[in-house]
């Protein structure tokens, strides 16, 4: 079984491991799609180039698309012996130690930095610029390793944005998970 957590939907796929044949697949659109203007149930505007997701949409893929693809394929769940999962990197999620997303906690629900920052979140460009400036100034190897420029789409740009703009979220998060 393959599960692809995409930008607008999640897909579940069953493949016959003996033949490589695609047996069945299901596309499950995310309820909240890409969150770019306002958080769900909020009128507060998000800053430009924000791209967030709701981790509850990922759970819906697991609880709806996975059983549906098994049924569609007329497969016996006991015959599924492997699961591959993918996201586009960097998709970053602040969580508690047990993996609970911060945005699912009432205290953090209205703070955009507690939500999943999607790969195409470019609101951390200032942080990426600072990482690049410091990396170049000190001839850091990571600048060369990343093709001469660190991107706002990558983990540490998003993490630094959280540190600067939402230090309480940063302190409350016991983990920052890279989904990709």
Where are these regions (language model features)?
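Gly/Thr-rich phosphate-binding beta-strand-loop-beta motif of the actin/hexokinase/Hsp70
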Residues: 1-29, 82-95
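Surface-exposed loop and turn segments in beta-propeller and other repeat-based domains
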Residues: 32-33
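Glycine-rich phosphate-binding/catalytic subdomain of phosphoryl-transfer
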Residues: 39-42, 47-60, 64-180
